[in-house]
Amino acid sequence: GAEMCIVKQNWVLKDIFITYVSLWKGIYLAAKSLNSNIMIKKILTVAMLVCTCSSSLAQPHVNDGTSYLMNQALDMSTDFLDLSNTLFFADHLESFDVKSGEGLVNWKRGHLMPRQAFNTNGAQPRKMRMLDFPFTAYENDPNLKFKIDFVTPRTVRIRMLTTPVEPKVSTSIMLAKEPGKDESWKVTETENTIVYAGNYGTVQINKNPWRVVLKDKTGRILSQTVTLRDADSTQVKYTPFSFIKRGSDNARRINPVFTLTADEMIFGCGESATGLNKVGQKVNLFVTDPQGPETDQMYKPIPFFMSNRGYGMFMHTSAPVTCDFGATYIGLNKMFMGDENLDLFVFFGEPKDILDEYTDLVGKPGMPPLWSFGTWMSRITYFSEKEGYDVAANIRKNKYPCDVIHFDTGWFDVDWQCDYKFSENRFQNPQQMLKDLKSQGFHVCLWQLPYFTPKNRYFPELIKKDMYVKNGNGELPYEDVVLDFSNPETVNWYQNKLAGLLNIGVSAIKVDFGEAAPLNGIYASGKSGWYEHNLYPVRYDMAVSEITKKLHNENIMWARAAWAGSQRYPLHWGGDAATTNTGMLGTLRAGLSFGLSGFSFWSHDMGGFVKSTPEDLYCRWLPFGFLTSHTRAHGAPPTEPWLYDSKRVQDVFRKSAEMKYRLMPYVYAQAKECTEKGLPMLRALFVEFPDDPGAWKVDDEYLFGSQILVAPLLESGITLSLIHI
């Protein structure tokens, strides 16, 4: 196959060369016979154009790919259908030590060959003889490391390399601790199988063809890997368990592929607003700013999911990932990873077991302070000390329960120009204001962000001190400075700025943005944005949470972006929802999905963010907002109930707030359990009722904690809806 392609290409190039020689010979004879300098120039110009066009057509067109706008989600599946890339298919187990769980898998080199059949072009995988040079330096079908570890009685770790080079040992900030080693699994070996049996599941490794089979404790197959030998067609309907070597840069990308069954449902993957069950969807795990929870992009993608069949998976990588859950082939779960190696944790059990195991690995949240569960009053934005006092007075005058007043982008001299300093013109004595508000029972939260425009007063200092993410030339990749939180000196500088605010009485920091870390940037960690982009919110959240904990001994912040590891730092909110029914539905689905991804605490802007909220929508959204772990009124004004002419809005706001405050003993007790077991406060029904088939299909209701069923009214003009009980 490959050799024939090269021979044909060589003949084509030879034909082109002969054509060029003939063309130039004809031009020379024509010009000589005309004996005209002007005509010679014209003929030569035409000839040059012809040759240029022919030359461009003769070049192989590779790595066409897809063009992306900056910091938009990446689809990692496209690489695996690029004909310029070399594929390696997992084939058989070359060797294996059952005691250490370590061995070698043989990978067959191949590529996709175009195939025309009855006027339809497809592609077929074909084995390929290596053309790499020198031949003695490389393997045609390499044997590469495969390792399986048993972390707990419910957790298994599967690792695979795509090169002979072992990765450097480094600490992962996604993990809360180094995975342990459990000795309870028993191993047996036959001629073609190795079986590790545990109390909650079984892992079977088939030798030839190589296959990993996951079973529950009764022996029922939950899922298994898929090889090239399983292909069911002459065309490529799917790519099996494989990795690629890209023709453009020799980078490797791995694609673990597992089966999906007919009745299977998949949940998780972060704060996703699309259908709660991800089967039939392609989910791109890449931190971005979707400007609201109404699309398939996410502020908080998480490389973790669980199945209704009794298992979950955590893809331990910070590279971009695309999960194809039966979207392009209904029977397969394909995890197209931007990483060259596989590090996959598998969990066995019911949803509660899986969440507990997963959050043991990546970390459980600290308990937020009691006051944080109360009402947060805000808008975009309060601009002055006077507005702060006025809001506080109106809250108390109208008897709305409230614990927090938030100042968004307007507390600086210039709106949105973060310099960690209250405007002297509009905040005459901020420290006294904070003290006065505290005496009235209010905590204060302040907005900020990690980007510095050229007009920001800290811009020159950050450039001088090299505290920013750089491009390949050591300069700014954007017009703005993006703080490099992988640099300890940057973290120290940043935390000192926040400490100045926390020390004068500020209670919490809003950790806004964090989704735009340069993908092609170079970071102080020594890694590129390919691995640091998705980690950026974890580092950002960590920096804010740790300084707040150090100075106030409280686990609190208000963050928008997240990745695996961020769940240790409560809390996060749902971003800039549209002030529409769609915005409300997307917010509910996003919150449920986020909770199924290991996050206990979450909030959202009641009524939406983008525009002023219609009365009917606000009244339907308020009970949903107050029956969430954390509650905030925020967005385009008015958000304050007393500014609505409608008595209905005022009454619904007050009654909803009073309801939550009466429930506070329940709320706090449930929250404490969530920190211990990794459970979400906003809980999908099947978490509590996994044996109810109908509960797995509900995405417009939820449990607030374990005992309160909530069914928000998601349509205009309705007062009742059918619910699943």
For each feature predicted by the language model, list its residue ranges.
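Aromatic- and carboxylate-enriched substrate-binding clefts and catalytic-loop regions
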Residues: 161-163, 170-173, 401-653, 688-690, ...
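Carbohydrate-binding surfaces of carbohydrate-active enzymes
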Residues: 126-143, 147-150, 158, 163, ...
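Bacterial Sec-dependent N-terminal signal peptides
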Residues: 11-60
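Extreme N-terminal basic, low-complexity initiation segments
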Residues: 2-9
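A low-complexity, Ser/Thr/Gly/Pro-enriched, surface-exposed linker/loop concept
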Residues: 67-192, 234
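Conserved small/polar residues in nucleotide/adenosyl-binding loops
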Residues: 5, 723-725
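Catalytic and substrate-binding clefts that recognize carbohydrates or anionic sugar/phosphate headgroups
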Residues: 61, 138-140, 161-163, 179-369, ...
